[in-house]
Amino acid sequence: MTKRTSAKHKIDRRMGENIWGRPKSPVNRREYGPGQHGQRRKGKISDFGIQLRAKQKLKGYYGDLTEKQFRRIYAEAERVKGDTGENLIGLLERRLDAVVYRAKFVATVFAARQFVNHKHVRVNGKIVNIPSYRVKEGDVIEVRDRSKQMVALIEATQLAERDVPDYIEADHSKMQATFVRTPALGDVPYPVMMEPNLVVEFYAKN
């Protein structure tokens, strides 16, 4: 098992949910958490625990962001006019690694981060190797010519387990995508329920 595969499986086990909807997730085979005592009946979870879990799940989904990274994004979502939870989702979906993942250029969020880091991606014709780079509406994201024949890339575009959402226009024949608009929570194809409102409650109290 690769380090990246281990990381995403660890997050699924920790959450007890298949948060990316992957067919090989370990939680598809059992309905209890990791560890020796995973099968014990869980007690009632406190409001704090519910809010913390919502935050950890959202952080994990976008590649297990650090608390510092996530808190910075949240602070920006809070400053922007409008609903903080919706703003948070919009900012997360505008990350370059998230757009590369949504466009189905790669199979996982973790692969997207590595793909960007290794300079396989251009934004509006310029190489960008920062996964957290903030994409704007109308930006064109494309795979570099020398990277377009990578086997993993071609396989990812053919994955049937998820579709490209309508706020991204992807042309896999050109390995190119356009970020059409910033999505609302209801537009984002999360395989599990994400509750940014609980994240807002968490940070309001902690």
Curated annotation (Swiss-Prot):
CDD domains in alphabetical order: S4
GO MF entry, a single one: structural constituent of ribosome
PANTHER family cross-referenced by the UniProt entry: 30S 40S RIBOSOMAL PROTEIN (PTHR11831), SMALL RIBOSOMAL SUBUNIT PROTEIN US4M (PTHR11831:SF4)
Function, in words: One of the primary rRNA binding proteins, it binds directly to 16S rRNA where it nucleates assembly of the body of the 30S subunit. With S5 and S12 plays an important role in translational accuracy.
GO annotation, biological process: ribosomal small subunit biogenesis; translation
GO cellular component: small ribosomal subunit
Presence of the UniProt keyword Ribonucleoprotein in the record: yes
Protein name (record): Small ribosomal subunit protein uS4
